[in-house]
Design a protein with these regions (language model features):
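Eukaryotic intrinsically disordered, low-complexity regulatory linkers and tails enriched in Ser/Thr/Pro
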Residues: 1-168
Length: 168
């Protein structure tokens, strides 16, 4: 066993900024790579990688060699889940635990408000490269998206954001 083992170099991904640190990567079964950086997860596509920012990763599942990531799209301050993307990892290295740790560390606070016969979840998350936290809302499944619900969301987001701004 060599005292100083040669470290593998991460794959080159177009779009990665000069000050962006590669945290981990994994080789996929189709010859691509999933790369985790300080800004998020670079997901392989047909032509190029695309960035899924840490603050937009809603859910990560690692099972049977497959990593699946559900990205949330922001629409009018609401987090709306996109369809999950998944990849079979040939060589996962430490990518799954690194991604899990980063996603968990990104969520600062979460609370649920009962409104309109349903519920809305409010989530404060860190945004890489910005100070403080940013609040978003997610209408929980089974809750109707009505004017009453939207008004409650707007009021609560304004209060939470004012509190966050005051604590900086």
């Amino acid at each position: 066993m060599a005292l100083f083992a040669k470290r593998e170099k991460p794959p080159v991904v177009d779009g990665v900024e000069k000050d962006e640190r590669v945290l981990s990567w994994a080789d996929t079964s189709d010859g691509g790579a999933v790369v985790a950086t300080s800004r998020g997860v670079w997901w392989p596509g047909s032509d190029e990688h695309r960035l899924i920012a840490w603050q937009h990763i809603d859910k990560v599942v690692w099972r049977d060699g497959i990593i699946a990531i559900t990205e949330a799209e922001v629409v009018d301050d609401l987090l709306v889940d996109r369809h999950p993307v998944s990849a079979l990892l040939d060589k996962p290295r430490d990518l799954p635990p690194v991604v899990r740790k980063r996603v968990e560390a990104n969520i600062v606070r979460s609370e649920v408000l009962t409104v309109g016969g349903g519920a809305v979840r409010f989530v404060a998350r860190r945004v890489p490269g910005r100070d403080g936290v940013h609040w978003w809302a997610r209408i929980e499944p089974g809750t109707s998206d009505t004017e009453t619900v939207r008004a409650a969301i707007s009021a609560r987001l304004a209060l939470l954001r004012a509190e966050a701004e005051g604590s900086r």
